[in-house]
Amino acid sequence: MQYRLLKRLRTLALTPLIITLAMGCSQAGQVVGASEPELPLPQNFQLHFNHRDAVRYRHPLNGDWRNGDNLEKQLIKAINAAKEEVLIAVQELTLPEISRALIRVKRRGVNVRVVLENNYSSPWSWQHPSDLTPRARQRQSQLQQLADTNRDERLTPDERLAGDAIALLMQNGVAMLDDTADGSRGSGLMHHKFVVVDRSLVITGSANFTSSGMHGDVGPSRSRGNVNHLLSIRSPDLAALFRQEFNRM
């Protein structure tokens, strides 16, 4: 009798633990322990990190799920919403989907202007490898791999154009300058990375508008690109300051 009572008490004591473990096992991918709560942002601010662990998106180069905010998607969303004006000042732009978004809104009548660093203002598909520095040849080779959508290691004329963000802008008449347009030798390194939409929204941060700056390099799926962020701020006063800087260049 006493043995049976002790056995039953032991079973009852273990039951909550068993239930807890079972519930935990039924929730796939749940991390044990509480995660750090995200700090609230001021009104009209949005912050995105391409290596953030709290969210995931599909890597555009290979379709795999990866951690982080899709910075390219955030830019395209803001561009698509433009009604009057989009100003972009960025050191390097090689993502064709951003160019296509700019072309779409331009066709709707939106005023689109782009300023680039002079070393990155020419279409890579127009350049001959023998005219390039070793570093520029390596960059061109990487962009060719990104443009080779069927991965047959042979670029067609259509693939070259579709994969060249600068050539797309030029072909579609998007107003574009580099930092030597005023007749100077340039700034040495025009390192701006900002977008102003409709004189009210500013998007700025650390990321160049490139695959390595936002998603990762072509090749190994483990590549998640440089660690970068974008900050979106809706403020006409701040937008006026960034427009002033844009017009100065």
Which residues are covered by each model-predicted region?
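Bacterial N-terminal signal peptides that target proteins for export
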Residues: Q2-A13
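Bacterial N-terminal signal peptides
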Residues: A13-A22
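Hydrophobic alpha-helical membrane context
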Residues: A22-M23, G205
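Bacterial signal peptide processing site
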Residues: S26-Q27
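HKD-type phospholipase D/PLD-like phosphodiesterase module
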Residues: V31-A81, E92-M249
